[in-house]
Structure formats: C-alpha cells, structure tokens
Regions:
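Pyridoxal 5′-phosphate
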Residues: 1-380
Length: 380
C-alpha cells in the first residue's frame, strides 16, 4: 500500500465524515445556493452558511460574511493582491514565498507596483527587524507566508501584524501551510487579509478555500457576475460576501469543508499539532543518523510546520523521489515546490530538495518505513 507523505501539497486520505458529506451533497443537496426560494436551494444555502461560520470560527473572525469562498489559496491570494494594489503602490514581500504570491506580484510589477523582497536567512526565517526596515513610509501592503512550504519555517506574523497596523500598512498572510496546524486569530494577530486552502491541513476537499477580509479593507473584485442579490443593477454589489463571490459556489466541496472543519474542531488543533510534531521529531532524529542526508530549515520543531526538506549526497532529488515511489511505494514531493526563491535562499536551486510532509493519518510506523527506505538508498 502506498505510503503518502505529501500532505503539504494536499492532505490524504480525507476523514471519513468529509467523504460522507461530499457524497451526500452530490446526491441530495447540490442545488444552487442563494439563487432560488425552493427548499433544495435553501438547503444548499444553509450548507454554505454552515461552512462559512465554521471557517470564521477557525480564524477568529467574528463576522462570517467576511469569509470569502474561493477554489484554493492561490485564488485567495490573487483576490487579495489584485484587489488591493494599484500602479504606484509599494508592497513588501519575502524570499520564502510560493509562486501563488510571486507570480501575481510579478504581474503587478509590470503594471507599475513597486515590489520589495526581504531575504530570509539560510534556515528560511525572515527576521522581523529586516521586514520593518523594508516597510518604509508609503508602503501599502506586507504580503508574506506564515509557514514555508519548503523548509517548514514558521514566521513571526504575530509580531509583524500588530506592527503593520500601527504603521497603517495592510498585512496579507498566506496560511497555506499553517491553517489547520497552528492557531490563527486574525484579531489578535492583526491580519487584514488571510488566505486559507481547505484541502491541506484542514483536511477538506480539493477546490475549497477562503480569503478572510478584515473590517474596513476594500477589495476590487477579481470576478464580476451573478451573485443572487441586487440583480436589477448592472453594478457589482457592495456587500460581503456577495461582492467578491460571483458565480455558483462549490456547494459540494463546501459541504466537505464544513465536515472537515467540524472534524478538526472535534479532535482539537493542539492534538493535531502535537501528533505531527512528534512525527517531525522522529523524522529529524532519524534523518540525522544518515550521514549522506543534509537537512534544511529549523533544527527544532517548536516553530516548524509540517514540511521537511532534505537532500541525499550523490543523488538528484528527482531520482530519490522516483526510487522512493517505484522501489518502496512511498510518495514524496521533489524539486522546487513552486517556490524557487525559497530554494535560492537555502542554496538548493535549481535541483531543489526532497520534501516529506506527514499528516494526521500517518503513524510512527510510517516514519520508520520511510527512514528505512532513505537509509537503503544512501547505503547503495
């Protein structure tokens, strides 16, 4: 049986309640929410509201209307970046960002936005003092990851969010690798815009995610169209969430997302974090005992997310990944992980690394199996 260790890309398997909810919605409740007064449409609307309320609870957002449903964190980040920034604006970002931030900012730079990139250290950590120095007067936005998808490094968002607010700078956080694994509170952390995927540590279906929009933040819509409200007007409505949610929502996926959020609430975020941290401790200890392994990122797991990167001396990471799959039936992610700047930062560009990322459904026996496979490869 395949050992899946690529949960930083998407969690697998999904909890059984998620599968059940998706199946039930597809068979019995996949009407168009907010588009009709008949019972099936109203039931679909209740499904969406339940997911929206649970998502708001996860991130400490008092008003569920400020949760905007999207297909993934990439769409959430595009909505935030293109919604806020205009020609002449200045945005500060970092060298640890995913292409979901890098590429929109490149497109915005071509439109006249000034983009300033703060380098991280070799562990992938971005010193807050360096970010503060880069945020000179006139900076419109800080856009940064909460947790690296390459090194697993957790960034000091809890310090930078309040500092940005005091300076009048908007704070956009990519929580792709932290939501569902670390506590998030947009109020306490002073986060104005938070991008969250539903399919990673939250354990929801693919095609789900949301953008949390803080009070007073005005975004230009990314999409325009039908919202089920104010249909007599050809102008996009001003109210949230309708202003930023044009078109039919993924009610089937949102049924699964709601089930995932309830599952996460039931087992407890701390329990998930402690389980994954124990697996990471085991991974780090085991890989350190293999002389040919070079590890990247934090040396301890206190501020370490679910992704762990390494290289094996004498092997291209792509070969390691291929052999783990074909000889040992183990799935990991290799290469640049859609974050080339992060690999430049840690010195692994252009080959990249082998990334292993355990999840809730992995066990210590799984990690033993993985370590034995890496040891066998290293031994030749």
């Amino acid at each position: 049986m395949t050992l899946y260790l690529d949960n930083a890309a998407t969690s697998f398997p999904k909890p059984e309640p998620v599968c059940t909810a998706v199946d039930h919605a597809m068979r019995h409740g996949a009407a168009n929410p907010g588009r009709g007064g008949y019972r099936l449409s109203l039931e679909a609307g209740r499904t969406v509201l339940a997911a929206r309320t649970a998502a708001a609870r996860l991130v400490g957002m008092p008003d569920p209307a400020q949760i905007i449903f999207v297909a993934n964190a990439t769409e959430a980040l595009n909505l935030a970046l293109f919604g806020v920034l205009r020609a002449g604006d200045r945005v500060v970002t970092t060298s640890m960002e995913h292409n979901a931030v890098v590429r929109p900012l490149r497109a915005l730079a071509d439109q006249g936005v000034e983009v300033v990139k703060v380098p991280a250290d070799r562990s992938g950590f971005i010193p807050p003092a360096d970010v503060k120095r880069a945020c000179t007067p006139g900076t419109r936005l800080l856009a940064m990851t909460h947790c690296s998808n390459v090194t697993g490094t957790l960034q000091a968002v809890e310090e930078l969010g309040p500092w940005c607010r005091a300076q009048g700078i908007l704070c956009l956080v990519d929580a792709a690798q932290s939501a569902g694994l670390f506590p998030l509170d947009v109020g306490a952390m002073a986060i104005d815009l938070l991008a969250v995927p539903g399919h990673k540590a939250i354990m929801g279906p693919p095609g789900t995610g949301f953008l949390c929009v803080g009070s007073g933040v005005q975004l230009k819509p990314l999409l325009y169209g039908g919202t089920g409200t104010r249909s007599m007007s050809d102008a996009q409505p001003d109210e949230l969430p309708e202003r930023l949610e044009s078109g039919t929502l993924n009610v089937v996926g949102l049924a699964g997302l709601h089930a995932a959020l309830e599952f996460l609430q039931e087992i407890g975020l701390n329990r998930v974090r402690e389980h994954e941290r124990a697996l990471l401790d085991q991974l780090l200890a085991g890989l350190r005992r293999i002389p040919a392994v070079h590890l990247y990122g934090p040396t301890a797991t206190e501020r370490h997310g679910g992704a762990l990167s390494f290289t094996l001396a004498g092997f291209d990471p792509a070969v390691v990944g291929y052999r783990l799959d074909h000889e040992f039936d183990i799935g990991v992610r290799v290469g640049l992980h859609c974050a080339p700047d992060a690999h430049r930062t840690i010195g692994t560009f252009p080959q990249g690394t082998v990334r292993v990322s355990p999840g809730w459904f992995n066990s210590h026996a799984d990690i033993d199996r993985f370590l034995a496979a890496v040891h066998a490869l290293a031994a030749g």
